[in-house]
Amino acid sequence: MAELGKKYCVYCLAEVSPLRFRCTECQDIELCPECFSAGAEIGHHRRYHGYQLVDGGRFTLWGPEAEGGWTSREEQLLLDAIEQFGFGNWEDMAAHVGASRTPQEVMEHYVSMYIHGNLGKACIPDTIPNRVTDHTCPSGGPLSPSLTTPLPPLDISVAEQQQLGYMPLRDDYEIEYDQDAETLISGLSVNYDDDDVEIELKRAHVDMYVRKLKERQRRKNIARDYNLVPAFLGKDKKEKEKALKRKITKEEKELRLKLRPLYQFMSCKEFDDLFENMHKEKMLRAKIRELQRYRRNGITKMEESAEYEAARHKREKRKENKNLAGSKRGKEDGKDSEFAAIENLPGFELLSDREKVLCSSLNLSPARYVTVKTIIIKDHLQKRQGIPSKSRLPSYLDKVLKKRILNFLTESGWISRDAS
């Protein structure tokens, strides 16, 4: 009895499941290739009837079937696999073709039949012309604005490289900015059955990752341009002193600090040129004001300006000496008037200048101050020696006066700070 699922030739009864010829005019007439090529006729079927080739995909194309030849179905799966997985991914290609083929068999069959075989010789020319055109400009020279000149490597020692986690040959750090940026694409994979929405979503992930890489490189360039790594290691102070040709004023330092957030939008040279031009502008304005002052004083030649400056310096020197002499007399008179209220009291000659100022400001007589000072120092020494003592300050000494005197004695070094 014929097995179910198999097809047989109606003329010779041979199995025709892999490949058979079906008559399009007669019903249930299917012939094997041998009977069809011999022009077999049976019943109402004639050799000149139309026919249809029915391929079951199981007939052998390459090699004898007994020796494991490749069927047409396997060939079709092989071509689909190499289009989907790419040349060289033999493991996935073998799994796609079927469990009966190993990766080694898939590789040997493809190389022998499609590269070194007749198909490869007919499709692949002996000499492949170079169709790639280099449209980039040379990396050096002024006529290459499209390419950035690579930055020189950092001049740091091996120990400093290990401290920073810096790899000079790759110009990378162990911990980069936005360290987890690669997680955006680490799980992406291009599948053969992805729809348009999934493809656009994966492209969006790749675009986000590219923007993160650009931001990482931008920060590297800023750090290299402004020498932030040597500044972190404390090696840029001597270089700055050598590079600067003039002393930076306090106003310029404050302005540099205010403009620091804008450093990322300009190069270091552009910022240095900006401040240098601002300094030149300031010097030019000062020179213009000086020339205008000469003109107001009737000087129209540079030779006359030297005599004018010498006379002006002499005049200012005389005025300064006169003011200095007057201020000295005023200080002496002021000091005498300041101590006039206590200079005739007993104990005034025992006080230092600072103590005289203190007693005058507190309106405290020298004798009372000496008494309070003696009691406070005595109590302090007894406490340091471990002798219990109870402070017995005079009744006329309130809390404000006590605090002022204690602070004064502490600042002068008579007692320690913990005692106050």
From Swiss-Prot:
InterPro entries: ADA2-like_ZZ (IPR041983), Ada2/TADA2 (IPR016827), Ada2b_C (IPR056267), Homeodomain-like_sf (IPR009057), SANT/Myb (IPR001005), SANT_dom (IPR017884), TADA2A_B-like_dom (IPR055141), WH-like_DNA-bd_sf (IPR036388)
Domain of life the protein comes from: Eukaryota
PROSITE patterns in alphabetical order: SANT, ZF_ZZ_1, ZF_ZZ_2
Oligomeric form and interacting partners: Interacts with GCN5L2, SMARCA4, SMARCE1 and PAX5. Component of the TFTC-HAT complex.
Residue span of region Disordered: 305-335
ZnF segments: ZZ-type: 4-59
One function term, GO molecular function aspect: chromatin binding
GO biological process: chromatin remodeling; positive regulation of DNA-templated transcription; regulation of DNA repair; regulation of RNA splicing; regulation of transcription by RNA polymerase II
SMART domains: SANT (SM00717), ZnF_ZZ (SM00291)
Signal peptide annotation: none
Disulfide bonds: none
Residues reported in the UniProt entry to bind Zn(2+) 1: C9, C12, C32, C35
Binding, Zn(2+) 2: C23, C26, H45, H49
Domain SANT: 65-118
Localization per record: Nucleus
Function: Coactivates PAX5-dependent transcription together with either SMARCA4 or GCN5L2.
GO cellular component terms listed in the entry, alphabetical order: nucleoplasm; nucleus; SAGA complex; SAGA-type complex
Keyword Nucleus annotated: yes
Recorded name of the encoding gene: TADA2B
PANTHER family in alphabetical order: TRANSCRIPTIONAL ADAPTER 2-BETA, TRANSCRIPTIONAL ADAPTOR 2 ADA2 -RELATED
Protein name as catalogued: Transcriptional adapter 2-beta
Key word Acetylation present: no
Keywords of this entry: Metal-binding, Nucleus, Transcription, Transcription regulation, Zinc, Zinc-finger
